[in-house]
Amino acid sequence: MTLKLYDTMAREKRDFVPADPGRVTMYVCGPTVYNHAHIGNFRPVVVFDVLFRLLRHVYGEDAVVYARNVTDVDDKINAKATAEGVEIKVITDRYLAAYHEDAAALLTLPPSLEPKATEHMGPIIEMIGELVANGSAYAAEGHVLFDTQAFPDYGQLSGRDLDDMIAGARVEVAPYKRHPADFVLWKPSKENEPEWDSPWGAGRPGWHIECSAMIDKTLGQTIDIHGGGIDLAFPHHENELAQSRCAHGAPVLANYWLHNGFLDMAGEKMSKSLGNVIIPHELLKTTPGEAIRWALLSGHYRQPLDWTPELIEQSKKALDRLYGALRRAKTVEAGESEPSDEVMAALSDDLNTPLAVSGFFELSSAIERAVTAGDELAITANKGRLLASAGLLGFLQADPDSWFEGDADDDLKAKVEDLLARRIAARTAKDWTAADAIRAEIDALGVVVMDGPAGATWRMKD
């Protein structure tokens, strides 16, 4: 089955053919660690986690190298540290740890590599030096800037033209720039800002050059896949591409450019500046990470996704249905299986996750029918296929009872099980008054009882 991916550069789906099937490389822009990441920041984390899982399934776990950087040099980080009166590393360590915690709660695999900007100053300065030496960059008033006019293909990725950029400019252009679109590779640091020595004076790098240098150092001059949110296509990815190609003379930086769409809130782009953000670090206190993950994958990754309370409720209900089928079949072991052809076909068509998850319900229905019929062979086969298919998207890896019981502690679990046993005894004795009273007692504990052919099960209320 051929994997097709939509390449932003080509403006079309293309068959994915890695340069080396034994070392498939992918780079995705990671967090700037100055605060908790919002749910929109986590959409690419989850989307490219699915691609990472798919590539590992196709080419082998050891054959895929996924790098996701950490930006730990930034004005916002400096401002946060100053406001709190602490060292910059206190801020970056705190929010990187929180980012890792949230990413794990959303069931994402850690990347193969996680390069930090502060740990790559040598390669960053070296790459800037190469650009200056070959005429692609110039020094001016303590800054080093990339000369966009020296790169004829500038604007190719985003479909922009240099002349249009001048006409559409709304900000004052620094007088030391040769062209308004020229961007900073190195800049002098202000007082109390971090700085590193360089041939152009003490200072720090611009954002774009950090990624170019880290890609080069961790993955190589040309990589298979570069991913990120669509908001990064310009200027960040456009500038990365220009820097890397000019530094090495390579014809391409990435053979495939993938971008996910925005996450909206009531039709508006979600962003910290608009104050309409959802923070997973807080949301996870009340909502299972798997439900958040389901919501993020409920639409095609290239399309905008509108985040609503209803979306989360729908995601919980979808997982309830799937875990419910697995719970009813829990006495039968799952068979060894590959993902279903339908799920593989959906994911191979530019990561069509909505179509892929629809295939889960066909398998769960088959499990339900097999349970009703007492067909253990069919249960084994379909259960194995469902778990393998869902695992490819990072779903259904929890114990079904754990999913329904949520954060219930051992004391509560024991109390509910005792009440259920007493309720069964009352129903067996046809003491309906006692049975109803026990059910009301269970309800008061925040527990929902679900009666089924295999007996009563329970779950915590939402």
Swiss-Prot record:
Its cofactor is Zn(2+). It catalyses: tRNA(Cys) + L-cysteine + ATP = L-cysteinyl-tRNA(Cys) + AMP + diphosphate. Coiled coil: none annotated. Binds 1 zinc ion per subunit. The keyword Ion transport does not apply. A motif ('HIGH' region) lies at residues 31-41. One of its GO terms (cellular component) is cytosol. ATP binds at residue 272. A motif ('KMSKS' region) lies at residues 269-273. Zn(2+) binds at residues 29, 211, 236, 240. CDD domains: CysRS_core. It is found in: Cytoplasm. GO terms for biological process: cysteinyl-tRNA aminoacylation. InterPro entries: Cys-tRNA-ligase, Cys-tRNA-synt_Ia_DALR, Cys-tRNA/MSH_ligase, CysS_C, Rossmann-like_a/b/a_fold, tRNA-synt_1_cat_dom, tRNAsynth_Ia_anticodon-bd. One of its GO terms (molecular function) is cysteine-tRNA ligase activity. It is an enzyme of class 6 (ligase). It comes from the Bacteria. Keywords: Aminoacyl-tRNA synthetase, ATP-binding, Cytoplasm, Ligase, Metal-binding, Nucleotide-binding, Protein biosynthesis, Zinc. Its EC number is 6.1.1.16. The keyword Ligase applies. Its main location: cytoplasm. Belongs to the class-I aminoacyl-tRNA synthetase family. Monomer. This is Cysteine--tRNA ligase. It comes from Caulobacter sp. (strain K31). The lineage of its organism: Bacteria, Pseudomonadati, Pseudomonadota, Alphaproteobacteria, Caulobacterales.
